[in-house]
């Protein structure tokens, strides 16, 4: 196993070649052992984890008694996994989680809107994520299918001044970690992108500043002489990590501004990655929207994420969409950078509305412009997760 990569490797006994790898549900894996169940005869792989955790220390002798500090943490946990060799991916420890997304109407300005339709994307069905059940919260909704994704539509005959209510959805989800098992040799000979994909995923349709000199120059520099799609993506990712440091911003700036500033949020990392990849004719799209707080041992406790989160997927012709994280692997200045979330996602990612807008507003069937009225000026969102059980 590899502590930094948060990964366990399965090797070919005779040659030592990697057959497949899986992500661990916790950070800092440091030891492995198989144990045979005496009753069933089944062998279970256990992983030892050794690291540090933050906690609030109560110091009665201090003027400020509650202090944030670290302590050692060591424990053992079984690792379950499944390798789908035919489709080139491996799944590991899964969890049944309940996620609720609720909007609380609280307009900054008094507005009235007739025939308002408020659309909120619903969780997706993927290799690593299965939707067991979705129920409405606060008021009923109808469902639409947009580009293969489920969308909840909340309808208001008239949104009145001073109106207050909550509405949203609650989902019961099975989520697992996934790691795609592709090498550059596997994608040496791939077909060309279809014209439909070129028109949709190689264009600047999200303020990516792809026509600016600084971004176009970065696109050339980012891949060097690489021609293989995986090596190109990895080179682009490492280039972006070299150029940026992570920092929360109140709003998302365009990639040209982000490059000059050298600091970006997850959304700004994604914007720059999208721009450079698309300029190098690699189809890609934004994916998100939330991460369950990564406390897999806190079952039955409501958990609240501090922020939303986005990452991206790139398309390999002849294979399909493959995930790539935005900033979490940018862990040290100038690298080297781990590969744990290159073609992989941890169990705590929740994929919602892949390739479509997360939320949108319309009145009488006409989309409302963000400059006139936006979701952020109408409501406050509330997101909660509860880990119900571990899936074996």
Region roles according to the model:
Residues 1-4, 45-50:
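Conserved beta-strand positions in repeat-built beta-propeller and related beta-rich domains
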Residues 6-8, 53-55:
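Structural signal for beta-propeller blades
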Residues 12-16, 60:
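Short loop/turn segments that connect beta-strands within beta-propeller blades
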Residues 21-26:
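Surface loop/turn motifs at the tips and blade-to-blade linkers of beta-strand repeat domains
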Residues 63-179:
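Intrinsically disordered, low-complexity N-terminal segments that are enriched in acidic
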Residues 146-148, 161-260:
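Acidic low-complexity segments
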Residues 268-367:
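Hydrophobic/aromatic-rich core segments of domains that either
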